[in-house]
Amino acid sequence: MKGSNDNSSRRLGVGFIGSGFNARFHMLGWKGVREGDVLGVWSPNKKNAASAAEYARSLDVGNAKAYASITDMVADPAIDAIWLTGPNQARIENVEEIVHAIESGKGSLVGIACEKPLARNVAEAKRVVELVKRVGLQQGYLENQVFSPQVEAGKELLWARGAATTGRPYLARAAEEHSGPHMPWFWQGALQGGGVLNDMMCHSALVVRHLLTKPGQPLATVTPKRVTAHIASLKWSRPDYAKRLSKSMGKDVDYTKSPSEDFASTTIEFETDDGQTVIGEASTSWSFVGAGLRLSAELLGPEYSMSWNTLDSGLKLFFSREVRGKAGEDLVEKQNAEVGLMPVVANEAVAYGYEAEDRHFCRVFLGKEKPKLTFDDGLEVVKILMTAYQSAEQGKTLEFPPRGLDKFVPAVAKGTWKPR
């Protein structure tokens, strides 16, 4: 596609930075993307890169191959855009290599999409934005939940029928909850940039703002004014569970000495463009034990409401205690049981919004749509997250944005936070 003036029938060649759980979820969602192909994977772990490329080929979503370096992938004329899905701590390094490859004339791209969060703190997020804008790339901020078909349909219908006749919605709630992430780096505050607030509140904080924003209007029409947050380590710093965690994730994860928060709640007061106050309540947890991952949202107005819960999937299976089998995640992500009455999320990549967001950003980079979310939106999310950490640390409500936000690093990320 590079250099083409007619993108109407062209397909976007996409390369992935990252080969883990998130990258594979995107690849699974790619089965519903007609505008692009997964053609490349780079990871510092060559074996994992090769495995992820093989996985993409097995799904028939592109003739993917593993690359020896990010520069090699950018230099390949078949690669038009990069999807950044690697660990948070590698974000700056990865983007710098992309930009250097472009500026040195080794390759070119039309766009770059970045998985949430954009970066670990405001300073790093601003650096990512500056680098990408310096080389004139189109941007896509990958926040799958706002692309969930249930979220989109619920929002559109409530605004069209309820808000149009009785007034705009005034309260939105969103939550993501499960029993903990797959990889050790997520649990290490210094690497990840925090705990569950940084890892998953980025979803919920944006979902509530998205729901409160009138369809077709920019997020800026609903402006954050005040933030109140709480964080806690409810489960994983308990001695028995800290020991289990260290055993499963390795000696570098020790929640008796350097815990991260496994629960966070945030209330965001917004002001609308017509001067009304509306509220967003966001919560997130690594200490939720249910059937598996639970995403939920609500939107409430004067005479209407909506609710969404991914575990209300419509399909349930029952297994008696006589059924024996290996532990797995074949019923639902972050699955916690294999017996009893269990919900099944039949197509998680669709239900959670991966398919729709990847299709959208392929179309954006082909010039067929305007981006719903850019890196500027990702930066705004990071600002809200860092304000939430400040509020939790200070134990009070803060005006948004607070002073010193650009230089702020959470105590969890410094390794100095102690649960109360």
What is each model feature region?
Residues G62-V132, Q150:
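Beta-loop-alpha module in the N-terminal Rossmann-like domain of NAD(P)-dependent dehydrogenases
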Residues T85, S283-T284, E298-G301:
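Short, well-ordered coil/turn residues at beta-beta hairpins
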